[in-house]
Amino acid sequence: MSSHIQIFDTTLRDGEQTPGVNFTFDERLRIALQLEKWGVDVIEAGFPASSTGSFKSVQAIAQTLTTTAVCGLARCKKSDIDAVYEATKDAAKPVVHVFIATSPIHLEHKLKMSQEDVLASIKEHVTYAKQLFDVVQFSPEDATRTELPFLVKCVQTAVDAGATVINIPDTVGYSYHDEYAHIFKTLTESVTSSNEIIYSAHCHDDLGMAVSNSLAAIEGGARRIEGTVNGIGERAGNAALEEVALALYVRNDHYGAQTALNLEETKKTSDLISRYAGIRVPRNKAIVGQNAFSHESGIHQDGVLKHRETYEIMTPQLVGVSTTELPLGKLSGKHAFSEKLKALGYGIDKEAQIDLFKQFKAIADKKKSVSDRDIHAIIQGSEHEHQALYKLETLQLQYVSSGLQSAVVVVKDKEGHIYQDSSIGTGSIVAIYNAVDRIFQKETELIDYRINSVTEGTDAQAEVHVNLLIEGKTVNGFGIDHDILQASCKAYVEAHAKFAAENVEKVGN
C-alpha cells in the first residue's frame, strides 16, 4: 500500500517572488480555488505581515476554501505570528509557518546573531505560535548550508516548543540527492518527540535539481513536498509540483508513495498559473509542455500507433490533456458550443455563454476550424476583461508619414465611463502605448513584450504578454485577439488597469 505524500503549494507566496510576477487580489483567489480543486493539502497563501494587500488576500482565501489548509508565513516575530493568526483564523484548517535562518553565513551577515540566540528565538516564537495554532510548521532557513549538529539542535528545539511540521529548505538550491536524503534520515533518527512529526522538503532549482532533491527527501523520510506550479519562483524557481506528483505516480514501484492530487486537473492548473503569471510554459516542459506527448520521429510515431506505451510512460488524459478533439466551425450553433464548453470542463452559465458565443462566431468567420485551444483562449481573454477595472473599447490606427503612426485609444471602466486619448509614435506599438500612457497619466517602462500564437497557422489568435514598471512596481498584462495590435493594446491596458486597481485610482481628466 502506498504511503501518502502531502503537497504544500507555495505558488502564491514563493512563486509570486518570481521577477515580474504580481498577482492581483482576484487572481490569488482564483488560483487558490483551483489549487483546492487540484487537491493540494496545504496552500501557503502569503506573508500577511509584509503588506496590507497580502494580509487581505490571505484572509479572503482563508474564508473561502473549505477543505485545504491555509498557511501564512511568519518570521520569528510575535507581530508576524499575530498577523498570520488574524488573517487565517476563519480558515477551516489554519496553519502558521515560522522561520529563521540557521546557516553560518546568514547568522554572521544577515541576522548578526549567535547560535544560542537563534535557539532562544526558535523556542520563544514557536511556543508563542503554538498558543494560537494547532498546527505550527517551523523552517530553519538555508538548512542545507547549516552544520548538521546545529540543525538537529534547531529542529529539536522547535519540536520541543510544539512544532509538528518541520520543513528543511534548500534555500539556494545548493544540495544534491544523497546529501539532502541524508539530512532527512539524520533528523528522523536523531530528533525525539511524543508527537508525530511530519518532515517537509522545500527545494529551489538553482542547480536544476529541485525535483530530484524533493524525491530524494521522500527516500530519506519526508512526508510532505513543498513547491510551486510550473516551478515558478525566485531566481531559477522552485520544485515543480506537477513533476513531483507524476514521478511518484509513474514510479510508484520504487517510491511506494502517492499524493492525493486530482491529476486530471494538472494541465488546467498549470495553464491558469501560466496565464496569471505571464510566464509561458516551455514547449518541452515535462508533464505540461506542449510537446510532452508529441512524437516527431518516424520510428517513435510508428511505435506509438502500434502501442502507446512503447514511447509514452503516462497518458495525456492522466493530466487532463484531451486527445480526442472535434473542432468547431462557422456553421456550429449555440448547442454545439455549449456542449464543447462542458466537454472542456467549464461550468459557465447561459448568460455568460451568450457573449462567449459571439466571440466564437467572430473567430469562426476568420478560421476554417476553431480548436479547443482557441476555445480556451476565448474564455481566458473574457475572464481577464471581466475582472479588469478598465478594458479596451476601440483602437484606431493611421499612417502619418516617415514611419510615424497615429493611434487613438478608447478605454471604458466598469461603471461605463469612457476615456480617450491619442498619440504619435515610431511604429504602431509605440503609438498605441503612448496613447494608453496618456489615458492613465502614468510614465511607464516596458520591461518585456512577448507574442505567442494560440494555435498553428497564419489564422491563429495572438496572445500578448507585457511587463511594465510603473512607479517602481512591476505589473503584467495579458491580451488575446485575432489582431496582434488589438491583443497588444489589450495587454497594455490590462497592466495599467491592474496597477490602478491595486492603488485604487481613477484615470483620465
Curated annotation (Swiss-Prot):
Leading EC class: transferase
Keyword Coiled coil on entry: no
Pathway assigned in UniProt: Amino-acid biosynthesis; L-leucine biosynthesis; L-leucine from 3-methyl-2-oxobutanoate: step 1/4
Cofactor(s), by name: Mn(2+)
Positions of region (Regulatory domain): 391-509
Cellular location(s): Cytoplasm
Keyword terms, alphabetized: Amino-acid biosynthesis, Branched-chain amino acid biosynthesis, Cytoplasm, Leucine biosynthesis, Manganese, Metal-binding, Transferase
Binding site for Mn(2+): 14, 202, 204, 238
Major localisation: cytoplasm
CDD domains reported in the protein's UniProt record: DRE_TIM_IPMS
Reactions listed under catalytic activity: 3-methyl-2-oxobutanoate + acetyl-CoA + H2O = (2S)-2-isopropylmalate + CoA + H(+)
E.C. number(s) listed in UniProt: 2.3.3.13
GO cellular-component term (any): cytoplasm
GO biological process: L-leucine biosynthetic process
A GO molecular-function descriptor: manganese ion binding
Function: Catalyzes the condensation of the acetyl group of acetyl-CoA with 3-methyl-2-oxobutanoate (2-ketoisovalerate) to form 3-carboxy-3-hydroxy-4-methylpentanoate (2-isopropylmalate).
Family, as annotated: Belongs to the alpha-IPM synthase/homocitrate synthase family. LeuA type 1 subfamily.
Subunit structure: Homodimer.
Name used for this protein in its record: 2-isopropylmalate synthase
Organism: Staphylococcus aureus (strain MW2)
Lineage: Bacteria, Bacillati, Bacillota, Bacilli, Bacillales
Gene name for this UniProt entry: leuA
